[in-house]
Every structure is written in structure tokens, then in C-alpha cells.
Amino acid sequence: MLKGRTAVITGASRGIGAAIALKFAELGANVALLYKSNSEKAEEVRKSAEAFGTQAKIYRCDVASAEDCRSAIAEIINNFGKIDILVNNAGITRDNILAMMPEKDFSEVVNTNLVGCFNMMKACTRNFIRNKYGKIINISSVSALLGLAGQCNYAASKAGIIAMTKSAARELSSRNVCVNAIAPGFISTDMTKELDSEEILTRIPLKRLGSPEDVANLAAFLASGASDYITGETIRIDGGLAI
């Protein structure tokens, strides 16, 4: 399904990013795993990915830094020869009510989640245009659609990703580059482990939290040829939360 493709995944050391990396490797893709600080976890994911018989390498990159992104992408192209798929998954939360939210927390979330997505897309764009092929998958959130309380920073950053996805899709479509977004609901990761799962389940029609593998399966579809006529779309994967 993805044999011969090279995929770049940010935030790949754990959670959704790790699941996507492993799913892509299982389907035959070579994977470049980007992480910010946890090299040990990233190395574990790399070893698991290579067990599928594909190439996997790790790269330290703070996506909020445009220079880090440019350097990482240049190194990846040097190592793999090309990039076919980019998954912008890196993200953080700093939840607080609006009246109590420090300006620093707002800026950090927007810089990592939204500016980081922009930095990575910009760093990869020339590669996609030159190759006349590309799949960009941006991880947004249902928070962008629902405006969850305590998440002014996070919701704004994820809503920005949806808008940026649409604009980039229009710009790059003539170059055979598809740009789509995934909007997960409550997924069982470190980011959601402190939440009251019983209360959350009352709001989800399918009555369960999602798994990172649920998101990875959708990402695999968007990375494959099966989605070649889909671009500029945001697909919810939330158990019906945002119906």
C-alpha cells in the first residue's frame, strides 16, 4: 500500500505519531521520525518500525523553529532521496480558562501546533513540487470545531490548521499534492490520561475513547493512492462526538 514511499512524521516518539509511524512501516513505507526531546522513546519506535523490514531513522527537531525544520528536511532528503508523505502531528496543550491563561502558554501552543505545521509544510513544499507528488496530513482536533472550554489556545491552533490545510490544498493541487487534515476526538494517549473518562464517554455516541491505531488507520488511507481524489478535507475521527 505504501511500499517505496518515504514518510516524515513529527511528534513520532509516542501516542498518535508513533502509531502512524508503525502503521506506515507495516504498509511498506520508509519512515523519518521527528522528536523534540525524548530520544529514547523515538529510538524504541525506530526499532519497532525497522522490524517491518523498512528503513527508519530518527531526527531531533523543534517544529516551532523554522531553522530546525529546514535542517531536518534537508537531512532526510539526503538520507532517503525524497519525501512522499508528511504528517504534521507534533502538538502540545497548556489548558486553562481564558481569564487565567498566561500569554506564554497561548504563544507556546500556537507556535508548536500551528506555526510548527506551517514550518514543516514550507520546508517540504519544494520537494513535493519537484517530484510532482505529495501527501500532507495535518493533525487537527475536534476542539477546533467545538471550542472546548479551557482550550482557547489549543482550539485556535487546531482551527488554524484546518484553514491552512484548505489554503495549501488549493495552492498545491496543480502539482499533484493532496493536503488533508484529521480531527481526532478523545484518543487514549498521554495527552488525555488525566481527563475524567466516565464523563467523556457520556458525550461520545460510540461509548469509547479512540485509540492511536484508529487515527493511524485513517492516516494510512490519506497517505495511500486510495485518497488521490481527496484534498482540502478535514475528517473527524471522534466516535460521533462532534455530530
Kindly label every feature range from the protein language model.
Residues 141:
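Residue(s) in the substrate-gating loop at a strand-loop-helix junction
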Residues 29-43:
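Conserved glycine-rich Rossmann-like NAD(P)H-binding loop of the short-chain dehydrogenase/reductase
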Residues 6, 13-14:
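Conserved glycine-rich cofactor-binding loop
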Residues 121, 157, 165:
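Active-site helix of classical SDR
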